[in-house]
């Protein structure tokens, strides 16, 4: 199977996962937490695989995310705990 076809399959799978997440979220509080977590983790997995297929290492993706988070922290409200917590999590991994 060609590399382009594999990338296209991963892209289609990612869109499918995001659609599934939106569907699960519309079900309200009756949704199993595992279903939400599975969608989120599967999307992250596909994005890491796609990045590798496109020639980027997992470390390069992590470093880019940290850079973007640092920039977001400097541009956003200094009290934005979501960005700060994610940045701290990524720093601890590497």
Name what the model sees in each region.
Residues 1-40, 44-94:
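Flexible "arm" and connector segments at domain edges
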């Amino acid at each position: 199977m060609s590399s382009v076809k594999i990338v296209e399959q991963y892209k289609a799978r990612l869109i499918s996962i995001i659609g599934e997440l939106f569907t699960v979220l519309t079900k309200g509080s009756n949704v199993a937490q595992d279903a939400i977590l599975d969608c989120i983790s599967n999307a992250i997995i596909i994005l890491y695989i796609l990045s590798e297929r496109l020639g980027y290492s997992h470390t390069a993706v992590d470093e880019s995310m940290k850079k973007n988070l640092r920039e977001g922290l400097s541009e956003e409200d200094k009290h934005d705990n979501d960005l700060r917590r994610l940045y701290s999590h990524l720093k601890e991994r590497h």
